[in-house]
Amino acid sequence: MENICELFDDVILEIMNLLSDTDKINFMFCCSRFYYFIDLVYYNDIYDYYKIQNVSFINKFKKIRYLAVTDTIPSVITHLELDKSFVGSLENCQLPKLSCLKLTQLQYDSFKIYISPAVKIDILKLPTYLKYIDLDYSWDIETYSNSNNVIVKRLRTDFICPVENREGPKCGLMKTSCISTNYYSANYYQYINSQQTQLVTGKHHVPNIQTNKSVKQPIKYSSNTKSTINNIFTNILNNIPKNIPKYTPNNIPKIVPKNTHYRNSSKKYRY
């Protein structure tokens, strides 16, 4: 046989199913004869749901990945990851094709009775080092510690006293501060080690070391700038090393210079 197009359909289909997904597509675009099989072959790579949701032959994709923020989850999903801020429950989710599930330990503890034993579970682990510093809208500093220390997911501060010069390292007064974690448990709040405390409350810029994401612009505190920690975390405050100054919202006025000009913490002052 001189022309492969003259093969029977089932033979061509069998050949295509032996190819990688990329080769299948390239093969189909050779001519209209092969393009006919686009909705007949199976695709074996993992695809994001939002990229193929409007494809009429979505059932031909063997692995479909989806990041769920709510419990409205498509039934065709095979690889599911629950967002750390996931809202809802897996109780009423119909996921007959689900084979892999990635979630946090707390989420697993909450939903494990609704998870089929056949589903492969991947529980997210907390890293044991400073992961990255996000200097976007919220000025979040995300840190992590090992199991012997407090698990600080996010130190959130409001920047209300920007300097006149918007260029260079940012400095000013950090108005409020609160610690939260997606892995929350009262037992986690034990103490912050000296290295973490220095990263959070030090006078100098946060060093870009042991990170997997470069710092666009380091935060540099002025001599009158202190990071304040909400007094509801008294058990943390009591264990901060003595050489690290501790300030609560009640005594902030004592450290604010009299000539300080307060401005609205709008977006334009955060850049």
Swiss-Prot record:
Residues 251-271 are annotated as: Disordered. Residues 4-49 form the F-box domain. InterPro entries: F-box_dom. Residues 260-271 have a biased composition (Basic residues). It holds the Pfam family F-box. Signal peptide: none annotated. This is Putative F-box protein L165. It comes from Acanthamoeba polyphaga mimivirus.
